């Protein structure tokens, strides 16, 4: 099969701008909070709470990867951002799976291998 060209950087830029606008709108009434990365734990539960399938996926990842409560919150923040980039109102299982995969890469031994 023929390789598909990647998404043009102009399209990526547009998605990022729209995601940032969603975040600014979400937090417009909360002083000092402008983006998902700044969410408190309470805000994470309000704005990034996954459905039951997502919660089960996250629990399984927490156990298998031995992740901390802090890592749990970081995964939810990243998943919320992925959902924003896709224009989704709610965090879905696929957003969590992607966020978990980034966390798993973060924990891998890439540095040991010099990669």
Task: Map each language-model feature to its residues.
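Basic, amphipathic alpha-helical bundle interface domains used for macromolecular binding and assembly
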Residues: 1-109
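Acidic, low-complexity intrinsically disordered tails
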Residues: 110-114
